[in-house]
Amino acid sequence: MSYGTNVVACCRRDLIPAVKRFIDGMPNPGTCFETPSIYALNRMLEHADARVCFMAAYFLPDVGLVFGADLPCPYETRLLRQEDFAELYLPEWSDALCSDRKELDVLGVGAYDNGNLVGFAGCSADCGSMWQIGVDVLPEYRRQGIASALTNRLARAVFEREKVPFYCAAWSNVKSVKNALRSGFRPGWAEITAKSNQFISEKFGKIGNFIEDEG
């Protein structure tokens, strides 16, 4: 990961020398995350039967923007707590909640149309002081400002609990990046994560297998 002026890397002990050479060979931190460098990183990871899997941008809140934003929601909103999530572990809310680690999902804000949940922002307690926000809106309710309204409301609720909200988006997910900015967040750091080829094939199915076959 990089905060802009540095690179922080975590890897298996046997990969440390190669990773150090990779980082030290770059003219600046940002170059580590550019496409030619990622190709080189993948070649290095071949020896560990792994390759780059996730490429994400993380956003931190601008307190003035979070509390100063005027983001009305066209639907009723409700604050939800962990005990309200049991029936919400569904594909349509997979960015807001994570069924693999339910114990970390702690708070949420839902948008309701005549009692039906149409948008949902949830946050997970990824560490003791910072809670990560994710948001989903049903396709037929998008482009109404629901995502940014829910994200902003949840960020405020997180601050009220004396935690720091943060937000993650895949680099290519421009809509999600725009939502972060509208909701009062600003770029914090960039991150690349490598996973085993088996993990990628299992998680991404045909896409993962295609990439593996092509490699």
Language model feature labels by segment:
Residues 1-85:
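Acyl-donor-binding surface of acyltransferase catalytic domains
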Residues 7, 129, 158-170:
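Conserved GNAT acetyl-CoA-binding A-motif
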Residues 13, 108-110, 125, 191, ...:
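Long, contiguous binding/interaction regions
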Residues 49-52, 69-116:
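Conserved acyl-donor/pantetheine-binding loop and adjacent beta-alpha core of acyl/acetyltransferases
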Residues 52-61, 186-203, 209-213:
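Conserved catalytic-core motifs of GNAT/GCN5-like acyltransferases
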Residues 100-107, 112-130, 135-138:
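A conserved beta-strand-loop-helix scaffold within acyl/acetyltransferase catalytic domains
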Residues 133, 143-157, 178, 182:
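Conserved acetyl-CoA-binding loop-helix of GNAT-fold acetyltransferases
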Residues 167-181, 186, 193-198:
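Conserved beta-strand-loop-alpha-helix junction that forms the acyl-donor binding cleft
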